């Protein structure tokens, strides 16, 4: 699978981290367990999840400790962001067509 060039990579990354945060909270994974896996402190992990930005090693630790399938998570978010890019492109094209008709 590749990432469509129309997909905003920043939005994609934030969506992946946001879903990871939700899954961590749902699974009741301890921040101290994630922190131990990535050699960070608990507060740093918690803040990174809230900020929707983190290092790859911290993300791997988060999905591992929460028993999340990282490939499935990324695949779902790529598909969602691709669908949003398609919808935006179609809406823009439809708007341009309606202006031409007027």
What is the meaning of each model-derived region?
Residues 1-33:
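A short, Lys/Arg-rich alpha-helix, primarily the initiator
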Residues 38-54:
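Recognition helix of helix-turn-helix/homeodomain-like DNA-binding domains
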Residues 1-7, 74-102:
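Short, charged recognition helix plus adjacent turn
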Residues 46-47, 60, 74:
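Key DNA-contacting residues within the recognition helix of helix-turn-helix
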Residues 52, 66, 77-81:
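The DNA-recognition helices of helix-turn-helix-type DNA-binding domains
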Residues 31, 42, 56-59:
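Helix-turn-helix DNA-binding elements, focusing on the entry/boundary residues of the two helices
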Residues 51-64:
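Short, basic-rich loop-to-helix N-cap that marks the start of a DNA-contacting helix
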């Amino acid at each position: 699978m590749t990432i469509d060039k129309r997909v905003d990579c920043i939005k994609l990354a934030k969506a992946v981290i946001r879903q990871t945060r939700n899954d961590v909270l749902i699974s009741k994974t301890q921040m101290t367990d994630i922190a131990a896996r990535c050699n960070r402190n608990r507060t740093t992990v918690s803040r990174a999840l809230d900020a929707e930005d983190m290092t790859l090693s911290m993300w791997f630790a988060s999905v591992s400790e929460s028993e999340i399938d990282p490939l499935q998570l990324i695949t779902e978010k790529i598909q969602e962001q691709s669908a949003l890019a398609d919808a935006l492109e179609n809406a823009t094209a439809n708007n341009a067509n309606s202006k031409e008709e007027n």
